Amino acid sequence: MTGRILSITVDLTPTVQNHAGLGRYAEEITRALFASCQPDERMCAFYTDPHRRRLSPPLDQLPASTLTLPNKLWRSKVMLAYALHLPQNQAIGQPDVFFATDHLLPYLPGAIKHFLLADLSFLSHSQTHTFLNRTFLQLMVPRFLRAADAVIAISQCTLQEALSRYPFIGNKGYVAYPGVGQHFRPVLDPARLDSVRARYHLPERFVLYVGTIEPRKNLVMLLGAFRQASLADLKLVIVGKRGWLFQEALARVHELGLEDQVIWTGFVPDDDLPALYSLAQVFAYPSLFEGFGLPVAEAMACGTPVLCSNTSSLPEVAGDAALLLPPTDVCAWSQALVRIVQDVSLHADLRERGLRQAKRFTWEASANLVRALYRELYARHP
């Protein structure tokens, strides 16, 4: 370094707008970078939000450049900026480093640009995106990847798929895993467990799912497997906000006559999730594909046995600490649910393996990688 202050701006738009996966990643990686900020660094934030929401502590301490544009309008402006080569520093400032976390990289010539790549579902599972979102991502992500100085994937699976589709990424591709928050650990305090159980009207024993309610999460299959398992003393608790085409899962509950067996909690704040995981007999995650699959790691960190799909990045996250199954095999999932619940030895083994596996994923390690990257690039920057 030359003695001048290095300005790093992170796009926290997905955090402010409460986007589940990208929002969590952007918030936590920024917290970790901010907590370990070097004397010659200045952390800043950028976000756009038409509802004028604010960042929560401690990120509200960051100097911030903000816009109130709707997402579609902001995307249009970025597309126009690339087409006409119009720098967007007036909106964002003059960062030395810009970390794009929302699959959107503003046109910032001269800045060192990190681009976070969560997944390539807009290509591999395009049916899970709206037409406009799919079209934008298919058109612009290749341009963003070319413009980026470093492409940061959230799993090896995502990086390898990106390299196969966009070989020009070459040696500027890296992996910085999402981390498991330090508060995700087994909850043993009976008072806290009872409080969370009462708050969400939870039964004594249940199977747990945590995630957005949308088709790619494959809840329709899980509901069928749960019904087939016929575990009379267990209910299914579904935690998460309603996403795109959530009605399919709701309709399936009625078709199967599971109204009294399924509990929908809606969104649950982060502070309550460790107790929810700790109360569950098993965590089930039947997603068709994931860029990472953070709930799997969080459940393991809380000592909850995990049953998840054997697709995309999930085997990478779960390692040997979960039962992995094809996401479309209803019978296999039904049998696995019964097995985990009834086999005390298996239940204990998965718990211990999961606790060890979850320790692999920390925000501090990923923040250290991101920092090392931008400092190396800055040192070589003309």
Predicted regions and their residues:
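Carbohydrate transferase catalytic cores enriched for Leloir-type hexosyltransferases
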Residues: 1-382
